[in-house]
Regions:
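Conserved Rossmann-fold dehydrogenase catalytic segment
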Residues: 141, 169-177, 200-216, 235-242, ...
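Short linear loop/turn motifs
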Residues: 281-291, 329-336, 393-409
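N-terminal helix-loop segment corresponding to the beta1-alpha1 unit
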Residues: 1-201, 375, 381-409
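Glycine-rich beta-alpha junction loops
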Residues: 51, 138-140, 212-217, 254, ...
Length: 409
């Protein structure tokens, strides 16, 4: 099925058209946040240091221009400028960019902007009272861990996330995707949108303090809440759910199947579907609490039945009967799946760019991939000109190494 047959094909200027975001972030959490904003029409000016966002080099794989899939995946729809913020002239240029900006987002070590004379409370809030300043850090500026840098895998470990991921045999395991970084990016985007909505009422901007640590701890449901209620430390259960069963991976003839049975009706329909109606009336499995307490016995009985079926038709049949079930797909399986294509979650833009799609579909103002990730410094001259800097001044800034159109190696 081609993307053109999807009901989401039309693209608009976007719900955030007219908003300007000055993006000083690099790596993942911040760039993911600003890509979400850019997908929905915000003008995002990606201000890169002279060496560029280091993720441009995080590969392989690389495209034919030598840029990594990692960088390409979270930087579409943006305009890139190179700017040396360690220089006074660079800071002055940043000040010009902020004059008509709605949002400033950065992920420097806490205190960096203050050291540069650009702290929110003392400078930015006074000079740009409508500016929303979002700071993304590992742990925040204060508290026992305040000021330390944060990294996704380290925060997964420190937050307790790894302690409940994996199996008794494997021990703690890092989640395969950078959930903390990306969850933090989502939280930053949500916070920015809330602040812009509130600004429409008050006329004032505000400072947003978003951390990887907070984002990771907030994801500890239900294990964190189970502990707060029971006082019992959660343990690693592998793929199984700590509160619900059968909620686990089961082998079939050809591929693993995941079941997520959450109530008695679903369990009865599952039992009927695998020609084992006796399971639904077995007193050991009469409700979720019993099924969860007797999960070992139930898993063995279900595994014996499920092994007789091929995964894909079984999963589809269960879904049609209202039983939550799905094959354990590989990444290639997902990228080629007709539903992925139908939902436009695999998209292309200019220059052969291909990436994951836009997850929020809006009916009147849909977003999308308007342009691929920018070449370093490709908008430097244009953005500085739009900020009121003359052509002669721009060339002087470039010649002095303050503004850049090519990466400094």
């Amino acid at each position: 099925m081609s993307p053109d047959s999807s009901p989401f094909s039309t693209m608009s200027a976007g719900a955030l058209a007219g908003y300007k975001v000055v993006d000083l972030t690099r790596v993942l959490g911040g760039p993911y946040c600003t890509m979400i904003l850019a997908d929905h029409g915000a003008e995002v000016i990606k201000v890169e240091p002279p060496q560029g966002d280091e993720t441009r080099d995080w590969g392989p794989p690389f495209n034919d221009k030598g840029e990594s899939a990692y960088y390409q995946g979270v930087n579409r729809n943006k305009r890139s400028i190179g700017l040396d913020l360690s220089s006074e002239a660079g800071k002055a240029v940043l000040g010009k960019l902020l004059e008509d900006a709605d949002v400033l987002i950065e992920n420097f070590k806490p205190g960096t902007l203050e050291k540069w004379g650009l702290g929110y409370k003392d400078v930015l809030a006074e000079r740009y009272p409508r500016l929303v300043h979002c700071r993304v850090t590992g742990f925040g500026a204060d508290g026992p861990l305040g000021g330390f840098p944060g990294y996704d895998a380290v925060i997964q470990a420190m937050s307790g996330m790894m302690s409940v991921n994996g199996s008794p045999e494997s021990g703690p395991v890092r989640v395969g995707t950078p959930m903390v970084d990306m969850g933090t990016g989502l939280n930053a985007a949500i916070a920015i949108l809330m602040a812009l909505l509130e600004r429409g009422k008050s006329g004032k901007g505000q400072f947003l303090d978003i951390t990887l640590y907070d984002s990771a701890v907030a994801l500890l449901h239900p294990q964190g809440n189970n502990y707060l209620m029971s006082g019992k430390p959660p343990v690693i259960t592998g793929n199984a759910h700590p509160n619900v069963y059968p909620y686990d991976v089961f082998p079939t003839k050809d591929k693993d199947l995941f079941l997520a049975v959450g109530n008695n009706g679903q369990f009865k329909r599952l039992a009927d579907a695998v020609e084992a109606p006796e399971l639904a009336v077995d007193p050991r499995f009469k409700d979720n609490a019993d099924r969860s307490s007797n999960r070992g016995a139930l898993k063995a009985l279900l595994a014996e039945k499920l092994a007789q079926y091929e995964c894909e038709p079984l999963a589809l049949g269960l879904l049609q009967k209202g039983v939550p079930a799905g094959p354990v797909n590989t990444i290639p399986d997902v990228m080629e799946h007709p539903h992925t294509i139908f939902r436009q979650m695999r998209v292309g833009a200019e220059n052969g760019y291909g990436a994951l799609g836009v997850q929020a579909k809006l009916s009147r103002t849909p977003g999308g991939a308007r342009s691929g990730p920018p070449k370093f410094g490709s908008a430097t001259r244009a953005v500085l000109s739009e900020a009121g800097i003359s052509a002669d001044e721009i060339e002087t800034l470039i010649n002095d190494g303050v503004a850049l159109v090519d990466r400094r190696k």
